[in-house]
Design a protein with these regions (language model features):
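Feature recognizes metal-dependent phosphohydrolase scaffolds
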Residues: 1-659
Length: 659
């Protein structure tokens, strides 16, 4: 057996984990068996925008996968449709549904518990049938792992009466000792996780919704999740690292939509210094342009905050600070080519007009008491103090820093997965369809190289020492990714926040999209991008989000090569998109696209209703996809090859067994 020195050293290291030929053989057999299993079901979701309850329901019902498992387990003779509906609701919301059932019936008898436990075991067995026993055991709740393992590996078709008696004794004991409710909750959560093997979040966990912190907590409970950062995610990440302009943007956006839950309750951000400053500085200013926006539901239920006038003052105060801070960044970085967003200095305080993109506009509000004519981008001493306090609060929020670490550990700007290319926004292009080159830290990048450069900069920003130019410049680039002219996450010439607040002329607020959005409609462009990123140009697809798919518009573009899964999960977009989000589901048989419709979750739990989802088949695979056909399988196959080489080394005497 001819082995290089380097290869022999590697096999020696590998032999420490597998010290005998028997152990190597066992592992090879195990891995080869895994390669023949069906691939797990993957779910792709984008643009959650902090809509926690809706996102959670989509996860719990796995875009209809749980209900499909129930239908596969039971015939109409075994269970009525109403009973299936109740079982599905119990799996989605076990704790809440148990409470509702007890409220309706007083108590639940042994017959109900016995039947329900056995039904749940059948559904769980179906949901976990693709996986090895080892993988299922690792996913089991610790307290019931042994019992669930015993129940899952029993079939009523078994001829052994002793085995049947054993299983029924387990179920009886669970009920007898008062653990049935806890067991129902545990096995229901196992089913929820089992029907989603991999979860891909294609950007924008954060935005105006008030539950982003809860979404992040939920994602951290999943073992196999990746995130392709969106523009809102990058903004919050930069804010968590203490970047002032990003902090101001996060606060302004939250305050505008009355989202104080994420800031104060979720992350413990102290808004008192900002509030006091706003009350003092804008005491006599009604700030009518800055009254918070209320959702349709809040308006219908008259759940407006009593202190809208105070909120408006805080909203204006942080908006003015934001525009100043952004101007400072743009003056520091002419290489961003965003001088068109430097307009404070053009303001005429006598005529109350301002010049933007070469046009003069009347200002709807010209009361800016902290604006300095000599340097309109300089913060007042009071504004400086406020921002120092806010930055301290963001950097020292334990929950926020935990979420930031998770985003860094599990996220990237793009990902190639099983031949598919995932990214949130766009690949910047020129008008002629060629890739756009941007200067990043003195070097020009386009396409994949550009996204790789930004990936690197975000990592640098996370570990570079504070108060260094390296950290400051890296954080400034993260802010640029939020709104920059050629940012792959923004995809717009400008974000017209200032114009929407202060300019009456709607044409001033028009946001021109990157040429990418025109070119990506063509299949040739999609194939070119897939090739650029090393994805599969023959069977691969681009999965993206960011731009809501309008009602009547197809989310599948470029002859099936591009799938946009931004379905408007935020309530304010439901009327635009005609739904409340998309989920792309890739199982071992086909690729499915589900468009979800709004649901009252409290009523759904009570009445055993489920979210209405329109499901279409995007692609049927020519044969069932196995583990060996996907990226994980290729990694396993390489592992098997290494182990076979180690086995040969043992047998040839090149390496001596350790046992």
């Amino acid at each position: 057996m001819n082995l290089t020195e380097e290869r022999l050293q590697y096999l020696e290291l590998l032999s420490q984990k597998f010290p005998s030929p028997a152990q190597v053989s066992t592992e090879i057999i195990n891995l080869n068996a895994i390669l023949g299993l069906p691939k797990g079901t993957e779910h792709f979701i984008s643009d959650i925008h902090g809509e926690y309850r809706l996102f959670l329901h989509i996860l719990k019902n796995a875009s209809g996968s749980v209900r499909r498992k129930i239908f596969q387990c039971f015939s109409e003779e075994e269970m009525t449709t109403a009973e299936m509906d109740e079982l599905a609701t119990l799996i989605y919301y076990p704790e809440e549904k148990l409470a509702l059932l007890k409220e309706a019936h007083g108590s639940l008898n042994q017959v109900w518990y016995t039947t329900t436990l056995l039904h749940l075991v059948q559904v769980c067995r179906k949901a976990t049938s693709k996986y090895t026993r080892s993988k299922v055991r690792k996913a089991m709740p610790h307290d019931f792992a042994y019992i669930i393992d015993e129940l899952l590996n029993y079939s009523e078709a078994d001829e052994d009466d002793n085995r049947t008696t054993y299983v029924h004794n387990i179920v009886h004991s669970i009920i007898e000792i008062g653990s049935a409710d806890a067991f129902i909750i545990a096995i229901s959560e196992l089913i929820q996780h089992a029907v989603i093997d991999k979860l891909h979040i294609v950007g924008d966990v954060f935005d105006r919704g008030n539950g982003a912190h809860k979404v992040m907590d939920t994602l951290m409970e999943y073992n196999n999740v990746d995130i392709q950062w969106g523009n809102h995610d990058i903004l919050w990440m930069a804010a968590a690292m203490g970047q002032w302009a990003s902090i101001a943007n996060v606060l302004r956006n939250c305050i505008r939509y009355n989202n104080f839950d994420s800031l104060e309750d979720g992350y413990g951000i102290n808004l008192r210094p900002l509030t006091q400053f706003a009350l003092e500085t804008y005491r006599d200013d009604p700030c009518t342009l800055f009254l918070p926006s209320h959702s349709k539901r809040e308006t219908e239920l008259k759940q407006r905050r009593e202190n809208d006038e105070l909120t408006a003052k805080v909203h204006k105060a942080i908006s003015v600070i934001q525009f100043k801070l952004e101007g400072r960044i743009l003056r520091d970085h002419p290489e961003y080519h965003m001088s068109h967003r430097l307009f404070w200095e053009t303001m005429d305080s006598k005529t109350h007009r301002i010049q933007i993109d070469g046009h003069w506009y009347d200002l709807k509000d010209s009361h800016f008491p902290t604006l300095s004519p000599e340097d309109p981008y300089r913060l007042s001493p009071e504004e400086e103090t406020v921002m120092n306090d806010l930055a301290f609060s963001f950097r020292n929020s334990i929950r926020m820093q935990r979420h930031l670490k998770f985003l860094l550990d599990n996220g990237s700007i793009y990902k190639v997965n099983n031949g598919y290319l995932l990214y949130h926004g766009c690949i910047p292009m020129n008008e002629d369809g060629t890739l756009h080159y941007s200067t990043i830290n003195g070097k020009k990048y386009a396409g994949r190289a550009m996204l790789e450069a930004y990936n690197h900069i975000i990592r640098v920003a996370s570990y570079a020492p504070r108060h260094t130019e390296l950290r400051k410049n890296s954080l400034d680039l993260m802010w640029y990714l939020w709104c920059g002219t050629h940012s792959p996450l923004s995809g717009k010439y400008k974000i017209a926040t200032f114009e929407r607040y202060f300019i009456a002329d709607d044409t001033a607020g028009k946001e021109e999209k990157d040429p990418y959005y025109t070119w990506i409609e063509q299949e040739t462009t999609a194939i070119r991008i897939l090739e650029e990123f090393g994805a599969d140009p023959v069977h691969g697809k681009i999965i993206t989000g960011h731009v809501p798919v309008k009602a009547g518009e197809s989310p599948v573009k470029a002859n099936g090569r591009v799938i946009n899964i931004d379905g408007g999960m935020n309530e304010r977009l439901n009327s635009v998109t005609g739904g409340c989000g998309y989920t792309l589901v890739s199982n071992s048989h086909q690729l499915l696209l589900a468009q979800h419709h709004p649901i009252n979750i409290s009523e759904a739990m009570r009445n055993n209703e489920d979210m209405h989802s329109e499901v279409r088949v995007v692609e049927k695979f020519p044969r069932r996809q196995l583990i060996r056909d996907i990226d994980d399988g290729k990694a396993i196959a390489r592992r098997v090859a290494d182990l076979q080489e180690l086995l040969e080394a043992y047998r040839s005497g090149a390496i001596t067994p350790k046992e």
